[in-house]
């Protein structure tokens, strides 16, 4: 088949050259072969799929030196001024087999919170939506009817952070007076006792990954008091306290290989062994507070056993035994993780980002500069190939998720960009800003897809449901908005 495609293209007297396919990790596919210089991505797709010999042909994108082959190989080679006397390496990348469409309209404006909405989060399958607010409540919203479902009262101060367990059965919330509460989304009732111990407010929450423990028993919290605590949610007690940071811990990630990562205003990131709390290494390099960080595997960890490609119109709870869920979560994690360990990206008040391989090395892989103001949030795309960073400089920047190389700036907001969220297929990005708008960006085209005005004031929180159906946003106007295509 591959030979037939190449033969067919050989008719006519066109300049030809030798090319070699390889995957992102540098693994060669087949031997070098000869193609016409004007070969198109469609033809490359046929050849590459024939070599891969998959049952179902995969949608693929092709690159030469980071530049995508869009119209023909020749045009890309010209733009990159590549030596064509040598073998040209073409990198192939499988693309998501499903496609998320950009949201275009607000379908509901949900009132209920009496103060600003500080956080919004969809559950791992997209079945439930939760929000945390300055009015001290957590609210669950019914997505089939887009109406308020439960109002959860228990906190006595602003709810600053919320996080879903990866099985979607519990939501943890942390507040300004240092307490962590757990909620059942199907009843709106508190689960177990209030987890107390932190002396200052909660800055982040992160659950043990589903593939490590399908019971979703442990959750970690970070606080302005400089510590990280790991809680046993079944027993309702603190399992261990990780101390070592000298200032506020700003964010926290529970990785998929048994490590916990904490970032702090003391300018460091600490890597801990989750099961016994031993400090493995300290990552240094930032010149100011570390505000935000993300893992290359975040999306797989967040969604656990849920596969966005198999989403149905009405989101359901996950079905299957704990063993089956664990296996599904494990295979999804390993697919995104790839051969090397998970990567971490951190963003700081010093306007820079660093890319790390924290399981192996305390030196950064790359220092990423270009933002003109502090960085609010950084996120890897679900397929881990691109890093997006949102900043007070009004821009969102895109970077290569493996090398940290700068790719593009997305401009359009007229004030600080607070939060961003990826669509499950890694093709779109939504951003919420102090300018009161949301914007949806086409990442490949590096341009604005849709502009979503509607909020009356700053937008603090935004999330895109893992099933791709909805975007939720909240902010200073106390309103929760749901956007659909």
Curated annotation (Swiss-Prot):
- Please give the tissue specificity annotation from the record for this chain: Highest expression in heart, brain, lung, liver, skeletal muscle and testis with lower levels in spleen and kidney.
Q: Which Pfam families match?
A: NLE, WD40
Per UniProt, which keywords does this protein have? Acetylation, Notch signaling pathway, Nucleus, Phosphoprotein, Repeat, WD repeat
> Highest lineage ranks of the organism?
Eukaryota, Metazoa, Chordata, Craniata, Vertebrata
* Coiled-coil zones: none
Which Gene3D superfamilies does the annotation name?
Answer: YVTN repeat-like/Quinoprotein amine dehydrogenase
Q: Which residues form the signal peptide?
A: none
Q: Which GO terms describe its biological process?
A: hematopoietic stem cell homeostasis; inner cell mass cell differentiation; kidney development; mitotic cell cycle; negative regulation of mitotic cell cycle; Notch signaling pathway; positive regulation of canonical Wnt signaling pathway; ribosomal large subunit biogenesis
Which cellular component, as a GO term, is one annotated location? nucleoplasm
Q: What is this protein called?
A: Notchless protein homolog 1
**What does the UniProt record report as the effect of altering residue 396 to S in this chain?**
In l11Jus1; embryos survive through implantation but fail prior to gastrulation. Cdkna1 expression is up-regulated while expression of several Wnt pathway members is down-regulated
Q: What residues bear N-acetylalanine in this entry?
A: 2
Phenotype upon knockout is: Embryonic lethality prior to 6.5 dpc with death of inner mass cells. Embryos implant but die shortly after.
Q: Which gene encodes it?
A: Nle1
Entry-linked SUPFAM superfamilies = WD40 repeat-like
Where does the protein end up? Answer: Nucleus, Nucleolus
């Amino acid at each position: 088949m591959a030979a037939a495609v190449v033969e067919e293209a050989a008719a006519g007297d066109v300049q030809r050259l030798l090319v070699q396919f390889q995957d992102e990790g540098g693994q060669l596919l087949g031997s070098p072969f000869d193609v016409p210089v004007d070969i198109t991505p469609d033809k490359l797709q046929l050849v590459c799929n024939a070599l891969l010999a998959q049952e179902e042909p995969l949608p693929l994108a092709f690159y030469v030196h980071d530049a995508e082959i869009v119209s023909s190989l020749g045009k890309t080679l010209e733009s990159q001024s590549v030596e064509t006397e040598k073998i040209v390496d073409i990198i192939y990348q499988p693309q998501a087999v499903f496609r998320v469409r950009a949201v275009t309209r607000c379908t509901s404006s949900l009132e209920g919170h009496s103060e600003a909405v500080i956080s919004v989060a969809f559950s791992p399958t997209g079945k439930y939506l939760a929000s945390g607010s300055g009015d001290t409540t957590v609210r669950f919203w019914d997505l089939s009817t887009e109406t308020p479902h439960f109002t959860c009262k228990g906190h006595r101060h602003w709810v600053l952070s919320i996080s879903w367990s990866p099985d979607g059965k519990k939501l943890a919330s942390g507040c300004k007076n240092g307490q962590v509460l757990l909620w059942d989304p199907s009843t709106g009732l508190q689960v177990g006792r209030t987890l107390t111990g932190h002396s200052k407010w909660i800055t982040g929450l992160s659950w043990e990954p589903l593939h490590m423990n399908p019971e979703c028993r442990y959750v970690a919290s970070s606080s302005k008091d400089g510590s990280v605590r790991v809680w046993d949610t079944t027993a309702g007690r603190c399992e261990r306290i990780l101390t070592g940071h000298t200032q506020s811990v700003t964010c926290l990630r529970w990785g998929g290989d048994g490590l916990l990562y904490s970032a702090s205003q003391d300018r460091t990131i600490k890597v801990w062994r989750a099961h016994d709390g031993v400090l493995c290494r300290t990552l240094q390099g930032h010149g100011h507070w570390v505000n935000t960080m993300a893992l290359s595997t975040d999306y797989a960890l967040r969604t656990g056993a849920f596969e966005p490609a198999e989403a149905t119109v009405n989101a359901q709870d996950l079905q299957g035994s704990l063993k089956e869920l664990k296996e599904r979560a494990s295979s999804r994690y390993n697919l995104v993780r790839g051969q090397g360990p998970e990567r971490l990206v951190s963003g700081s008040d010093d306007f820079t980002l660093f890319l790390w391989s924290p399981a192996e090395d305390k030196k950064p892989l790359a220092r990423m500069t270009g933002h003109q103001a502090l960085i609010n949030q950084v996120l890897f795309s679900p397929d881990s190939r691109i890093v997006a960073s949102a900043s007070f400089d009004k821009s969102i920047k895109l970077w290569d998720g493996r090398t940290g190389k700068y790719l593009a700036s997305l401009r359009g907001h007229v004030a600080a960009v607070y939060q961003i969220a990826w669509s499950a297929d890694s093709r779109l990005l939504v951003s919420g800003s102090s300018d009161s708008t949301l914007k949806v960006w086409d990442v490949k085209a590096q341009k604005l897809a849709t502009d979503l005005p509607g909020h009356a004031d700053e937008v603090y929180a935004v999330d895109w449901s893992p099933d791709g159906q909805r975007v939720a946003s909240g902010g200073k106007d106390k309103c929760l908005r749901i956007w659909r295509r």
